Protein backbone atom coordinates (compact mmCIF):
# COMPACT_ATOMS: atom_id res chain seq x y z
CA UNK A 1 0.00 0.00 0.00
CA UNK A 2 1.61 3.23 -1.16
CA UNK A 3 1.72 6.58 0.59
CA UNK A 4 -0.12 8.22 -2.31
CA UNK A 5 -2.97 5.71 -2.05
CA UNK A 6 -3.35 6.25 1.68
CA UNK A 7 -3.44 10.03 1.26
CA UNK A 8 -6.00 9.70 -1.52
CA UNK A 9 -8.18 7.48 0.67
CA UNK A 10 -7.93 9.83 3.64
CA UNK A 11 -9.08 12.74 1.47
CA UNK A 12 -11.87 10.74 -0.18
CA UNK A 13 -13.13 9.51 3.17
CA UNK A 14 -13.19 13.06 4.56
CA UNK A 15 -15.42 14.19 1.70
CA UNK A 16 -17.65 11.14 2.05
CA UNK A 17 -18.20 11.10 5.82
CA UNK A 18 -18.90 14.84 5.96
CA UNK A 19 -21.77 14.48 3.46
CA UNK A 20 -23.48 11.24 4.51
CA UNK A 21 -27.26 11.54 4.79
CA UNK A 22 -28.25 10.45 8.28
CA UNK A 23 -31.32 9.41 10.19
CA UNK A 24 -30.20 10.47 13.69
CA UNK A 25 -30.36 7.70 16.25
CA UNK A 26 -31.25 8.06 19.92
CA UNK A 27 -27.65 7.80 21.10
CA UNK A 28 -25.78 10.10 23.47
CA UNK A 29 -21.99 9.86 23.59
CA UNK A 30 -19.82 11.54 26.20
CA UNK A 31 -17.37 14.09 24.82
CA UNK A 32 -13.68 13.17 24.88
CA UNK A 33 -14.28 9.49 25.65
CA UNK A 34 -13.04 6.77 23.31
CA UNK A 35 -15.59 4.25 22.05
CA UNK A 36 -15.70 0.81 20.50
CA UNK A 37 -19.00 0.17 18.73
CA UNK A 38 -19.77 -3.55 18.69
CA UNK A 39 -22.82 -5.56 17.73
CA UNK A 40 -24.66 -7.40 15.02
CA UNK A 41 -23.55 -7.04 11.42
CA UNK A 42 -25.43 -4.21 9.67
CA UNK A 43 -26.87 -2.87 12.93
CA UNK A 44 -25.63 0.63 12.08
CA UNK A 45 -22.23 0.90 13.77
CA UNK A 46 -20.58 2.81 10.92
CA UNK A 47 -23.52 5.21 10.81
CA UNK A 48 -23.05 5.95 14.50
CA UNK A 49 -19.53 6.98 13.53
CA UNK A 50 -20.93 9.21 10.77
CA UNK A 51 -23.42 10.67 13.23
CA UNK A 52 -20.60 11.51 15.64
CA UNK A 53 -18.59 13.08 12.81
CA UNK A 54 -21.60 15.24 11.87
CA UNK A 55 -21.89 16.36 15.50
CA UNK A 56 -18.20 17.30 15.63
CA UNK A 57 -18.44 19.31 12.41
CA UNK A 58 -21.56 21.05 13.75
CA UNK A 59 -19.53 21.96 16.85
CA UNK A 60 -16.95 23.70 14.67
CA UNK A 61 -14.43 20.99 13.85
CA UNK A 62 -13.11 20.91 10.28
CA UNK A 63 -13.55 17.83 8.14
CA UNK A 64 -9.74 17.78 7.76
CA UNK A 65 -9.50 16.96 11.48
CA UNK A 66 -11.27 13.66 10.80
CA UNK A 67 -9.11 10.62 10.15
CA UNK A 68 -11.69 8.05 9.07
CA UNK A 69 -10.41 4.81 7.58
CA UNK A 70 -12.47 1.91 6.26
CA UNK A 71 -10.47 -1.29 6.51
CA UNK A 72 -12.97 -3.15 4.29
CA UNK A 73 -12.11 -0.96 1.29
CA UNK A 74 -11.24 -3.30 -1.59
CA UNK A 75 -8.41 -0.98 -2.66
CA UNK A 76 -6.51 -1.90 0.49
CA UNK A 77 -4.29 -4.98 0.58
CA UNK A 78 -4.00 -7.04 3.74
CA UNK A 79 -2.54 -4.84 6.46
CA UNK A 80 -0.23 -5.40 9.40
CA UNK A 81 -0.27 -3.45 12.64
CA UNK A 82 2.76 -1.41 11.48
CA UNK A 83 0.64 -0.10 8.59
CA UNK A 84 -1.61 1.64 11.11
CA UNK A 85 1.28 3.88 12.12
CA UNK A 86 1.95 4.44 8.42
CA UNK A 87 -1.63 5.70 7.95
CA UNK A 88 -1.16 8.08 10.90
CA UNK A 89 2.13 9.33 9.44
CA UNK A 90 0.51 9.99 6.06
CA UNK A 91 -2.21 12.05 7.73
CA UNK A 92 0.40 14.07 9.64
CA UNK A 93 2.17 14.85 6.36
CA UNK A 94 -1.11 16.18 4.94
CA UNK A 95 -2.35 18.29 7.86
CA UNK A 96 -1.16 20.10 10.97
CA UNK A 97 -4.27 19.13 12.94
CA UNK A 98 -4.40 16.63 15.76
CA UNK A 99 -6.65 13.97 14.19
CA UNK A 100 -9.80 12.44 15.61
CA UNK A 101 -9.63 8.76 14.68
CA UNK A 102 -12.55 6.79 13.24
CA UNK A 103 -11.34 3.25 12.49
CA UNK A 104 -14.03 1.21 10.74
CA UNK A 105 -13.78 -2.62 10.89
CA UNK A 106 -10.24 -2.43 12.23
CA UNK A 107 -10.43 -6.03 13.47
CA UNK A 108 -9.30 -7.03 9.97
CA UNK A 109 -5.80 -5.93 11.02
CA UNK A 110 -4.06 -8.48 13.22
CA UNK A 111 -2.94 -7.13 16.62
CA UNK A 112 -4.74 -3.83 16.07
CA UNK A 113 -5.39 -3.61 19.83
CA UNK A 114 -1.81 -2.49 20.50
CA UNK A 115 -2.24 0.49 18.19
CA UNK A 116 -5.61 1.36 19.75
CA UNK A 117 -4.19 1.25 23.26
CA UNK A 118 -1.29 3.49 22.27
CA UNK A 119 -3.61 6.07 20.68
CA UNK A 120 -5.63 6.20 23.88
CA UNK A 121 -2.49 6.54 26.00
CA UNK A 122 -1.41 9.44 23.78
CA UNK A 123 -4.77 11.13 24.51
CA UNK A 124 -6.19 10.93 21.00
CA UNK A 125 -9.96 10.76 20.61
CA UNK A 126 -10.73 7.42 18.96
CA UNK A 127 -13.83 5.62 17.68
CA UNK A 128 -13.68 1.99 16.52
CA UNK A 129 -16.17 -0.42 14.98
CA UNK A 130 -16.12 -4.18 14.61
CA UNK A 131 -18.83 -6.64 13.71
CA UNK A 132 -17.61 -10.20 13.86
CA UNK A 133 -16.87 -12.62 16.65
CA UNK A 134 -13.37 -11.20 17.11
CA UNK A 135 -15.01 -8.12 18.60
CA UNK A 136 -17.03 -9.64 21.42
CA UNK A 137 -17.63 -6.90 23.97
CA UNK A 138 -16.52 -8.96 26.98
CA UNK A 139 -13.15 -9.75 25.41
CA UNK A 140 -12.52 -6.31 23.90
CA UNK A 141 -13.03 -4.61 27.27
CA UNK A 142 -10.22 -6.74 28.69
CA UNK A 143 -7.95 -6.43 25.66
CA UNK A 144 -8.15 -2.64 25.57
CA UNK A 145 -7.46 -2.36 29.27
CA UNK A 146 -10.25 0.02 30.23
CA UNK A 147 -9.17 2.72 27.80
CA UNK A 148 -12.40 2.58 25.76
CA UNK A 149 -16.12 2.55 26.43
CA UNK A 150 -17.72 -0.49 24.83
CA UNK A 151 -21.01 0.56 23.20
CA UNK A 152 -23.35 -2.21 22.07
CA UNK A 153 -25.20 -1.15 18.91
CA UNK A 154 -28.63 -2.64 18.31
CA UNK A 155 -30.99 -2.41 15.32
CA UNK A 156 -33.59 0.33 15.24
CA UNK A 157 -36.08 0.62 18.05
CA UNK A 158 -39.68 0.90 16.84
CA UNK A 159 -39.49 4.66 17.38
CA UNK A 160 -36.34 4.89 15.24
CA UNK A 161 -37.85 2.59 12.61
CA UNK A 162 -40.86 4.88 12.30
CA UNK A 163 -38.56 7.91 12.10
CA UNK A 164 -36.64 6.22 9.27
CA UNK A 165 -39.98 5.94 7.49
CA UNK A 166 -40.71 9.66 7.96
CA UNK A 167 -43.02 9.33 10.96
CA UNK A 168 -42.20 11.27 14.12
CA UNK A 169 -44.06 9.45 16.86
CA UNK A 170 -43.78 12.53 19.11
CA UNK A 171 -45.51 14.83 16.62
CA UNK A 172 -48.88 16.21 17.65
CA UNK A 173 -51.85 14.05 16.60
CA UNK A 174 -49.62 11.65 14.64
CA UNK A 175 -51.29 8.62 16.25
CA UNK A 176 -54.52 9.74 14.63
CA UNK A 177 -53.36 11.23 11.34
CA UNK A 178 -50.92 8.39 10.56
CA UNK A 179 -52.70 5.55 12.35
CA UNK A 180 -52.92 3.15 9.40
CA UNK A 181 -49.32 3.73 8.32
CA UNK A 182 -48.05 3.26 11.88
CA UNK A 183 -49.88 -0.06 12.20
CA UNK A 184 -48.53 -1.18 8.82
CA UNK A 185 -44.96 -0.25 9.71
CA UNK A 186 -45.22 -1.81 13.16
CA UNK A 187 -46.26 -5.09 11.55
CA UNK A 188 -43.27 -4.93 9.19
CA UNK A 189 -40.99 -4.12 12.12
CA UNK A 190 -42.13 -7.15 14.11
CA UNK A 191 -41.93 -9.39 11.04
CA UNK A 192 -38.49 -8.37 9.81
CA UNK A 193 -36.83 -6.60 12.72
CA UNK A 194 -35.19 -3.20 12.78
CA UNK A 195 -31.98 -3.59 10.80
CA UNK A 196 -31.55 -0.18 9.12
CA UNK A 197 -30.90 -1.57 5.64
CA UNK A 198 -34.29 -3.30 5.57
CA UNK A 199 -36.11 0.04 5.61
CA UNK A 200 -37.79 0.44 2.24
CA UNK A 201 -36.84 -3.05 1.02
CA UNK A 202 -39.69 -4.67 -0.87
CA UNK A 203 -38.56 -8.18 0.06
CA UNK A 204 -36.01 -8.24 2.89
CA UNK A 205 -36.21 -11.98 3.56
CA UNK A 206 -33.54 -13.03 1.06
CA UNK A 207 -31.19 -10.30 2.27
CA UNK A 208 -31.75 -11.35 5.88
CA UNK A 209 -31.19 -14.99 4.96
CA UNK A 210 -27.80 -14.10 3.48
CA UNK A 211 -26.96 -12.09 6.59
CA UNK A 212 -27.89 -15.04 8.79
CA UNK A 213 -25.54 -17.27 6.81
CA UNK A 214 -22.67 -14.81 7.29
CA UNK A 215 -23.30 -14.66 11.02
CA UNK A 216 -23.84 -18.41 11.33
CA UNK A 217 -20.76 -19.56 9.44
CA UNK A 218 -18.50 -16.54 9.90
CA UNK A 219 -19.13 -15.74 13.55
CA UNK A 220 -20.51 -18.81 15.32
CA UNK A 221 -19.21 -21.89 13.52
CA UNK A 222 -15.77 -20.51 12.67
CA UNK A 223 -15.05 -18.83 15.99
CA UNK A 224 -16.14 -21.70 18.21
CA UNK A 225 -15.01 -24.43 15.81
CA UNK A 226 -18.38 -26.11 15.92
CA UNK A 227 -18.32 -29.44 14.12
CA UNK A 228 -22.01 -30.25 14.51
CA UNK A 229 -23.19 -27.17 12.61
CA UNK A 230 -26.35 -28.95 11.44
CA UNK A 231 -27.45 -29.42 15.05
CA UNK A 232 -26.77 -25.74 15.75
CA UNK A 233 -28.82 -24.70 12.73
CA UNK A 234 -31.73 -26.92 13.79
CA UNK A 235 -31.51 -25.59 17.33
CA UNK A 236 -31.69 -21.98 16.16
CA UNK A 237 -34.72 -22.73 13.97
CA UNK A 238 -36.56 -24.60 16.73
CA UNK A 239 -35.89 -21.84 19.25
CA UNK A 240 -37.22 -19.25 16.79
CA UNK A 241 -40.36 -21.33 16.25
CA UNK A 242 -40.87 -21.59 20.02
CA UNK A 243 -40.29 -17.94 20.83
CA UNK A 244 -43.63 -17.65 22.65
CA UNK A 245 -42.87 -20.38 25.18
CA UNK A 246 -39.91 -21.15 27.45
CA UNK A 247 -37.61 -24.02 26.54
CA UNK A 248 -35.31 -25.89 28.90
CA UNK A 249 -31.86 -27.02 27.77
CA UNK A 250 -33.03 -30.62 28.09
CA UNK A 251 -35.99 -29.87 25.83
CA UNK A 252 -33.77 -28.16 23.25
CA UNK A 253 -31.41 -31.15 23.20
CA UNK A 254 -34.34 -33.55 22.86
CA UNK A 255 -35.93 -31.61 19.98
CA UNK A 256 -32.66 -31.47 18.03
CA UNK A 257 -31.86 -35.13 18.71
CA UNK A 258 -35.28 -36.14 17.39
CA UNK A 259 -34.22 -34.89 13.93
CA UNK A 260 -31.47 -37.50 13.79
CA UNK A 261 -28.54 -35.37 14.94
CA UNK A 262 -27.74 -36.13 18.57
CA UNK A 263 -27.18 -33.10 20.78
CA UNK A 264 -26.32 -33.38 24.46
CA UNK A 265 -27.71 -31.03 27.09
CA UNK A 266 -24.20 -29.73 27.78
CA UNK A 267 -23.75 -28.93 24.08
CA UNK A 268 -27.12 -27.15 24.03
CA UNK A 269 -25.98 -25.01 26.96
CA UNK A 270 -22.74 -24.18 25.15
CA UNK A 271 -24.52 -23.32 21.88
CA UNK A 272 -26.99 -20.99 23.58
CA UNK A 273 -24.07 -19.30 25.32
CA UNK A 274 -22.32 -18.77 21.99
CA UNK A 275 -25.37 -17.01 20.60
CA UNK A 276 -25.86 -14.69 23.56
Feature annotation, model-predicted:
Residues 2-13, 160-276:
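Interdomain hinge/linker elements that couple catalytic modules in large macromolecular machines
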Residues 13-32:
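Pre-Walker A adenine-sensing motif
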Residues 37:
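Hydrophobic anchor at the beta1->P-loop junction of P-loop NTPases
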Residues 41-42:
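Walker A (P-loop) phosphate-binding loop of P-loop NTPases
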Residues 45-46:
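Conserved lysine of the Walker
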Residues 67-99:
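Short glycine-rich substrate-engagement loop in P-loop NTPases that contacts/grips substrate
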Residues 125-131, 152:
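Structural recognition of the conserved hydrophobic beta-strand(s) that form the central parallel beta-sheet
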Residues 134-150, 163-167:
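Short regulatory helix/loop adjacent to the ATP-binding pocket of P-loop NTPases
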